[in-house]
Amino acid sequence: MEESSSVAMLLPDIGEQEAILTAESIISPSLEIDEQRKTKPDPLIHVIQKLSKIVENEKSQKCPLIGKKRPHSSAATHSLETQELCEIPAKVTQSPAAVTRRAEMSQTNFTPDTLAQNEGKAMSYQCSLCKFLSSSFSVLKDHIKQHGQQNEVILMCSECHITSRSQEELEAHVVNDHDNDANIHTQSKAQQCVSPSSSLCRKTTERNETVPDIPVSVDNLQTHTVQTASVAEMGRRKWYAYEQYGMYRCLFCSYTCGQQRMLKTHAWKHAGEVDCSYPIFENENEPLGLLDSSAAAAPGGVDAVVIAIGDSELSIHNGPSVQVQICSSEQLSSSSPLEQSAERGVHLSQSVTLDPNEEEMLEVISDAEENLIPDSLLTSAQKIISSSPNKKGHVNVIVERLPSAEETLSQKRFLMNTEMEEGKDLSPTEAQIGREGTDDVYRADKCTVDIGGLIIGWSSSEKKDELMNKGLATDENAPPGRRRTNSESLRLHSLAAEALVTMPIRAAELTRANLGHYGDINLLGPDTSQRQVDSTLAAYSKMMSPLKNSSDGLTSLNQSNSTLVALPEGRQELSDGQVKTGISMSLLTVIEKLRERTDQNASDDDILKELQDNAQCQPNSDTSLSGNNVVEYIPNAERPYRCRLCHYTSGNKGYIKQHLRVHRQRQPYQCPICEHIADNSKDLESHMIHHCKTRIYQCKQCEESFHYKSQLRNHEREQHSLPDTLSIATSNEPRISSDTADGKCVQEGNKSSVQKQYRCDVCDYTSTTYVGVRNHRRIHNSDKPYRCSLCGYVCSHPPSLKSHMWKHASDQNYNYEQVNKAINDAISQSGRVLGKTPGKTQLKSSEDSADPITGSSENAVSSSELMSQTPSEVLGTNENEKLSPTSNTSYSLEKISSLAPPSMEYCVLLFCCCICGFESTSKENLLDHMKEHEGEIVNIILNKDHNTALNTN
């Protein structure tokens, strides 16, 4: 691919100039002739296209041509008499001339922001790197130098893409060739450039008399111009540059960095800019400046996606209706022109024209019917996942329209109906298929298209009421159209990219026999993690997966060059403003659902978990989790039971049942420790206090108080020489029967939940699982004074506990800052009390309590409750902490051994198994050992009742 050039526009201003619609295409290998104009695609489309290349590990085979509309704020409307033509007339477009600059930047065209007066010609120069517009060429040259570009300037006329290095020569070309043609084009209301082999700019008037509605045509042999009544879509604004010396530079604030990840982080500051898109890099060794040019296709066809407005009236500031003509460019490297083939017409109550020269299949999903079918990144991700990586040239294109903030929710838009039936069930009245030689004409009276035995329908405005009766009701939880904040935009960009890359490639295996079930919308039950309409779209994505691999799945499209679909819609108002947003509203819907669920405590891991669960889910997933279609049995294997949703394997069927709970989401405001479901966030916070250690135990002999009864008992025994029986008698809480011999626990009922509660017989620790209390009980019988309150992990080294707590960072009510502070305080305090009495050590460390207000005190690690061992054990632990990296002192083992009395023990860093107490100085040995307890670990983390798990068998 040849090095592209940045563009500065040289534009002749004309009064009748109304609008222009540009399209993104293949960059010409010669600067003499540029065949197509490029427009900025939807950022979400850009993200998905880039990530689909990563997932499929192949080069891009597509070049999307996406027609967009955008009203011009300063364009004056002119009422022109409609000619007696079949098509809807369009305004004349006088395309501007341009100034081009050589650099390592992709070529981008911009339309003028200002219009000259009706009389006379004014040359304007516009920089392609930003929006800067000037009537002086010298001023623009100085401006371009500010971008760090020092190469020579190349001028280009954007009307016919003729290039020249002489300013006078190109200005004369614009005046002579385009001045007299303006009036002719105004009267004819249409224009088109000639073949790319011509160096002159000629214009012809073209009419499409066969199409009564909006004509959309694709021609493989000619370059194109696109006409519309609205002003052209602004091209991609290159807000970052890749310097020759290997540095990335932000053009907004001149920020420079040497790594791509630093530039992505810096993009937070500019996420709200209109033309600022989140940087997505194709690969690490590709220069950043070649981002746009990466869309150029290898030898192969060009896939075009065109969304046309239906027969309903389109209102753009009282302007005329729209005519769109798009022609895809040919491969300029071919020496001989391609032969014109017969065209295939597909009529979906609108006119659609196709060219049959390509083998790629195009899938189009429109989300403009946002209120009836909320769009979803999950559907986009699933379409990328379900696409066959072995099919060369297969293209997945997701088309989304960003609604303006001023658009009302009651507007009628085009709706994509996902009713799917087997091709054999299609009645003759629904579709009439005629085949004559190489010309295949499909007439679908019911707005259906036959794609490899699969019927996909797009409903017109008459079918909307019928669809509403079938259950596609407006979602009340859908957020209103609003502009996202900078942090939301960039955070969602990151999550979209991360989720699509990390999504599991293995999709649910569906057969052709399953298509009949998914075809009926009424049979699709709502999933706990997804709305019903999203489940319908997800089912459509999964249905397409087996069809792509089947031999008969693409028979109806094997000869199709590109697929153009006209989607009817109702009247649509287009506002003046442009949405300052980076991606679609669907991602905002996902994050707002999680925000409502977790009361603004959702983390990135929660959102990624939401995306992955929704992508993995199937209709009625709660019941299917226990079915054989999710658990795969592999005979003669060491671990015969395998989860289809992930890579988990187990030799015990009960353990795999427990593991499946990982893929089941919690209900809104459900307690993460037990099964209690609160009504709101305040109710959940009040409930969480029952799981927290918030009670204060006052010593009857002195002024000291403790958060745990075991601390009080040890304090009274060591400081006041009281026996254990007296300690129990002086406590503030009556005891329930205990069994101290084996450390067994007492079962009791919890008023706040229907779950059974297990209580420790030594202290008042309670848990909903027997295993949790059993692991807790080891604290009173071991010399490991630090424990994890989430899973029962115990250790004698505070840094080990700090490292362990990262495993629970995704917990909804986990407060890492609070836990980390408590551990650091325990380390610093225990380091300062070397040589002091163990009693004072316990008193000072008792400050590490949980915060009952935040509702996360169950997750907070309190080291004081565990420092209740003998004096030798406590002092030994303190000496071990002297060796920790977080301690300021640097005593060696020899010094500690010499300072310690003969009866004192000192600890070394050990890795402890939280299930059976196995210890090892090697972390690898512990990980190998922990494989034996996979099922129990899952049970502990999920805090589920062991008896309930056995009942599910």
Swiss-Prot record:
One of its GO terms (biological process) is positive regulation of transcription by RNA polymerase II. Residues 854-891 have a biased composition (Polar residues). Residues 470-489, 831-891 are annotated as: Disordered. A zinc finger (C2H2-type) spans 125-147, 155-185, 248-270, 641-663, 669-691, 697-720, 758-780, 786-808, 911-933. PROSITE patterns: ZINC_FINGER_C2H2_1 (PS00028), ZINC_FINGER_C2H2_2 (PS50157). GO terms for cellular component: nucleus. The modification Phosphoserine is found at S95, S427. InterPro entries: Zinc_finger/UBP_domain, Znf_C2H2_sf, Znf_C2H2_type. Pfam families: zf-C2H2. Keywords: DNA-binding, Metal-binding, Nucleus, Phosphoprotein, Repeat, Transcription, Transcription regulation, Zinc, Zinc-finger. SUPFAM superfamilies: beta-beta-alpha zinc fingers. Coiled coil: none annotated. It comes from the Eukaryota. It is found in: Nucleus. GO terms for molecular function: DNA binding; zinc ion binding. May be involved in transcriptional regulation. Belongs to the krueppel C2H2-type zinc-finger protein family. This is Zinc finger protein 507. It comes from Pongo abelii.
